[in-house]
Amino acid sequence: MTKNQNFIETKEYKRFAEFCDACIKYQYIGICYGQPGVGKTLSSRYYTNWNTIEKQVNHRGWEDLASKTTDDILSVNKIFYTRPAEKQTRLSNDLYSISASIDLGQKLHIVNKYGHDHSKHYSDMFKYIDLIIVDEIDRLKVQHLEQLRAIYDEHNLAMIFIGMPGIEKKLSRYPQLYSRIGFAHEFDNLSKDETHHILEYKWQDLGFDLKLEDFTDYEAITTIIKITKGNFRLIHRLFAQIDRIMDINGLDKISTEVVETARDSLVIGIR
């Protein structure tokens, strides 16, 4: 699924959103873990509206920031952050920079669009931030975890760490941080019924109607479910190949042969 496509709120997403809401309510640190491709990052970005906000806070100075802001910036109370693999700077600097950009963007937008001074004093760093989601927590070193703990202790907010299964064991080695974790959530694969639901949307995206009474459609769906095993990312990668194969060959029907050819075109992720 690309950033421009509609997000489908699955049961797993709704469970994740409830988990995030609980962390905010109690101002806890939470950990969310799951296999690659189940939808952790996509769900986090959707929950924080980060696809919209990220474009506004990534700027080249205040004039650039002022030209990008929309009313969405005014309601920002969550931050989504992924630690770049190549950067060695302080993680806390990145988070403070994002928060400062949100703060400045809110001020500039109110002044420029509404012609009056900002109604709230966005001065205390993270004052209006309720939640920071940190993706790929597995990448972080001890000093980065300590920086996150310091931010959590200094500000009234919640944090959620996103990672692979087993991340809770890694974090347990750092008792000062681990003692602050209040909730844990496993992000699971899609159920068979939800995969069916997603596939209906994917059929429509390609301009086709899914008809389960049509054996060709039924057989294709069964094959896709068997291949992807409910893995969200794998479904979308497979359909990108299906779309390409059908376009090249001028086909108007998704068959098992098309699905298997698409599977063989994928570099990784199929066993």
Curated annotation (Swiss-Prot):
SUPFAM superfamilies: P-loop containing nucleoside triphosphate hydrolases (SSF52540). Keywords: ATP-binding, Nucleotide-binding, Transposable element. The keyword ATP-binding applies. It holds the Pfam family AAA_22. It comes from the Bacteria. GO terms for molecular function: ATP binding; ATP hydrolysis activity. ATP binds at G34, Q35, P36, G37, V38, G39, K40, T41. PANTHER family: GENERAL SECRETION PATHWAY PROTEIN A-RELATED (PTHR35894), MU-LIKE PROPHAGE FLUMU DNA TRANSPOSITION PROTEIN B (PTHR35894:SF5). This is Potential ATP-binding protein.
